[in-house]
Amino acid sequence: DHNIPPDIEKGSNKNIGLFHGPVTGLYTDIGYKFEDEFDVDKFNGCDVVLCGDIHKRQVFDIPDGKKAYMIGSTIQQNFGETLSKHGYGVYNVEEDQYDFIDLPNPKPFLKFEISSIDDLETGKEKLLNY
């Protein structure tokens, strides 16, 4: 019962929701879909929701045609995550604009497909987690 949202009264100000946890319908980098987690309908009354927990960056719909943003992780945390699309986000309240900002990872977890030594010698190895 700890995930019971408050009643949000609509006023003249923007209601910005902050949430940490998995949300039903979102995915991890390895393709796992959250089926029975926090329901997006509980964000009713929010003009935008900024979320954290799932390491995969995602944008999803909330009630009243509004958007929510799962920021993802600042850098790749393990081999199961993609190398790209990690960083932070900036929300412009006045323009209702959200931008993802990528950060470089100085020590990435690289995952390659190499069939033989020839792949390395001819440059045919494939980076799988970009």
Predicted segments — roles?
Residues 1-68:
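His/Asp/Glu-rich metal-coordinating catalytic cores
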Residues 68-130:
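Binuclear metal-dependent phosphoesterase catalytic core
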